Swiss-Prot record:
NCBIfam families: murG (TIGR01133). This is UDP-N-acetylglucosamine--N-acetylmuramyl-(pentapeptide) pyrophosphoryl-undecaprenol N-acetylglucosamine transferase. It catalyses: di-trans,octa-cis-undecaprenyl diphospho-N-acetyl-alpha-D-muramoyl-L-alanyl-D-glutamyl-meso-2,6-diaminopimeloyl-D-alanyl-D-alanine + UDP-N-acetyl-alpha-D-glucosamine = di-trans,octa-cis-undecaprenyl diphospho-[N-acetyl-alpha-D-glucosaminyl-(1->4)]-N-acetyl-alpha-D-muramoyl-L-alanyl-D-glutamyl-meso-2,6-diaminopimeloyl-D-alanyl-D-alanine + UDP + H(+). UDP-N-acetyl-alpha-D-glucosamine binds at T12, G13, G14, N124, R161, S189, I243, Q288. CDD domains: GT28_MurG (cd03785). It is found in: Cell inner membrane. One of its GO terms (molecular function) is UDP-N-acetyl-D-glucosamine:N-acetylmuramoyl-L-alanyl-D-glutamyl-meso-2,6-diaminopimelyl-D-alanyl-D-alanine-diphosphoundecaprenol 4-beta-N-acetylglucosaminlytransferase activity. It comes from Acidithiobacillus ferrooxidans (strain ATCC 23270 / DSM 14882 / CIP 104768 / NCIMB 8455) (Ferrobacillus ferrooxidans (strain ATCC 23270)). Belongs to the glycosyltransferase 28 family. MurG subfamily.
């Protein structure tokens, strides 16, 4: 029987997209891959769309929640572990790969109780609670950033879709471009209201000659209001709730304005694209700021804090970048130097190695 891997990943695109990149690498080697997640996270749409089976657990995050949720936590976690054990038996998975997010904890514990090898991948520069708890139980632990602190962690980078790695170099992409500078605005898989609110106002204060072309991902509920803001400012912009073909968007852009989720940072590096990064200020342990500093220290980005951010400040930061193609190219090339293109293959190979000799 072919090797079988159960991938636990859920919640936001920051967990799901890297998990799908590893899944594709496993499937290319003949491994049977199934997913464990929730019915409410992005995995509920993205995983089936990519041709994988998703088994759902009744599980919710706890950090930052009210006291009632914490009081119910032991019962919810216990139930989720039992659900995960049933899924592992049903799928006859040889190995579990935890890709972070709260769904990883019950699936990882279930794997340990059944004697199945557990591999973990931590996407962020600050390790999440689930991975910190599970790391002592894991056979292999992989890190998306070199500064993340997990026991026995190996820095491999964050898995990224192959289509993004396959983009031409920044020099090749930028060489013959004509017309306005191309600005990609994206708030992660769920959008960012601060970017939706401030971008049109910042760009409206520019002349027609300096204003860039815009491709803006708003998140599910904010496309119409953002289109209206651009229309009121008399700015022509391509506005979408969600960009399905991120490789096309990154390949199109000269510069990005975005959040600093782990998947976003990895995709900017893989593509080779400089960025103005505005970390989500309420991220657990402020991990998006730590992610952003990775590219900023490499000379590939500038980090702005959301607190106090207004249209004037953003306009002042954008103007020199829009006016200087050599600066944009330097940022893009610096970003590309941070890419680790073999992350998905490395994690997939470790899962296959751990599956050796396991009778599911």
């Amino acid at each position: 029987m072919a090797d079988s891997v159960l991938i636990a990943a859920g919640g936001t695109g920051g967990h799901v997209f890297p998990a799908l990149a590893v899944a594709d690498a496993l499937r290319a080697q003949g491994v049977e891959v199934t997913f464990a997640g929730t019915a409410t996270g992005m995995e509920a749409r993205l995983v089936p769309e990519r041709g994988y089976t998703l088994h759902t657990l009744d599980m919710q995050g706890l950090r930052g929640k009210g006291i009632r949720r914490w009081l119910r936590a032991p019962w919810r976690v216990s139930r989720a572990i039992l659900q995960a054990r049933r899924i592992l038996r049903q799928t006859r998975s040889h190995v579990v790969l935890g890709m972070g997010g709260y769904v990883t904890a019950p699936v990882g514990i279930a794997a340990w109780t059944l004697g199945r090898p557990l591999c973990l991948h931590e996407q962020n520069a600050v390790a999440g609670l689930s991975n910190r708890l599970l790391a002592p139980l894991a056979r292999r632990v992989f890190l998306g950033f070199p500064g993340a602190r997990l026991a026995r962690g190996e820095w491999v980078g964050n898995p990224v879709r192959e289509a993004i790695h396959a983009l031409p170099t920044p020099q090749e992409r930028f060489h013959d471009r004509k017309g306005p500078v191309r600005l990609l605005i994206m708030g992660g898989s769920q959008g960012a209201q601060v970017l939706n609110a401030v971008s049109a106002a910042a760009l409206s204060g520019m002349t027609d000659a300096e204003r860039p072309a815009i491709w803006h991902q708003t998140g599910r509920d904010h496309a119409e209001s953002t289109r209206a803001a651009y229309a009121q400012a008399r700015i022509d912009a391509k506005v979408e709730p969600f960009i399905d073909d991120m490789a096309a968007a990154l390949g199109w852009a000269d510069l990005a304005l975005c959040r600093a989720g782990a998947a976003t940072i990895a995709e900017l590096a893989a593509a080779g694209l400089g960025a103005i990064l505005i970390p989500f200020p309420f991220a657990v342990d402020d991990h998006q700021a730590a992610n952003a500093r990775f590219l900023e220290k490499a000379g590939a980005a500038r980090m702005l804090r959301q607190e106090g951010l207004d249209a004037l400040q953003l306009r002042d930061v954008l103007r020199p970048l829009l006016a200087d193609p050599e600066l944009r190219l330097r940022w893009a090339e610096a970003a590309r130097r941070q890419a680790k293109g073999d992350a998905a293959a490395t994690v997939a190979a470790a899962c296959i190695e751990c599956a050796g000799g396991i009778d599911a």
